[in-house]
């Protein structure tokens, strides 16, 4: 993370060094009361404001949300328990989400479990808690209320569960994954061994360091998978399960 107090949102996006690779949606950096899909507009990164941001290359959107602070002491008084009351339960729910990413699981069951883990009156999740991703960021979703669609090997799934609260703002652990049965994992290891090794290494990190329940059928596609840094001016502080 390259966020620094006082820099503009344009400078922050430049620090991401997107580099010209094809994008699945525009880059977002929404600071303060800016709409959630806002692009940079010249706002300054100011201590004590909420912020969300994403960069979406084809096949995976990386999005995070938190507060422009270094510790809970710099949060608004009403939000001082942001981690305990909001961000930490969300991280545990994302562990539950990972555990469900197995061939044969019904999409409606994922929706039900996410609504149970993230009660609406506190977390306000309204969009599908996860969806398919491709060249476009949002393709379609088997995860919805009452869905009988079955998760299948080969699905590129976006962990996209968006909470919102009037006091706590938001939090996010959004990255791309692939659901892969044993045949697909064997094919990947044979044809693209370096990719397979990176996926395995990240899954181990998520299990052993963060404490998440990541099945062997879920392949993480980024080195940000599993990371929630609630205090954006001190990203070395990350949450664990």
Residue ranges and their predicted role:
Residues 1-241:
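Active-site neighborhoods and metal-handling regions in enzymes and metal-associated proteins
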């Amino acid at each position: 993370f390259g966020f620094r107090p006082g820099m503009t949102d344009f400078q922050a996006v430049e620090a991401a060094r997107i580099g010209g690779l094809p994008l699945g949606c525009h880059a977002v950096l929404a600071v303060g009361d800016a709409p959630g899909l806002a692009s940079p507009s010249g706002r300054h990164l100011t201590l004590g404001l909420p912020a969300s941001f994403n960069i979406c290359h084809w096949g995976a959107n990386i999005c995070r949300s938190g507060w422009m602070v270094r510790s809970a002491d710099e949060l608004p008084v009403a939000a001082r328990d942001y981690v305990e009351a909001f961000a930490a339960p969300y991280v545990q729910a994302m562990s539950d989400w990972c555990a469900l990413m197995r061939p044969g699981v019904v999409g409606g069951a994922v929706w039900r479990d996410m609504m149970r883990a993230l009660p609406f009156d506190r977390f306000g999740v309204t969009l599908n808690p996860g969806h398919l991703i491709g060249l476009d960021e949002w393709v379609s979703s088997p995860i919805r209320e009452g869905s009988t669609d079955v998760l299948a090997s080969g699905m590129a799934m976006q962990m996209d569960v968006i909470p919102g609260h009037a006091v706590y703002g938001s939090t996010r652990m959004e990255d791309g994954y692939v659901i892969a049965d044993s045949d697909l994992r064997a094919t990947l290891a044979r044809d693209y061994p370096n990719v397979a090794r990176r996926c395995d290494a990240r899954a181990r990190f998520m299990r052993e360091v963060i404490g998440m329940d990541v099945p062997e059928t879920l392949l993480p596609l980024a080195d940000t998978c599993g990371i929630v840094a609630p205090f954006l001016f001190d990203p070395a502080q990350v949450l664990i399960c």
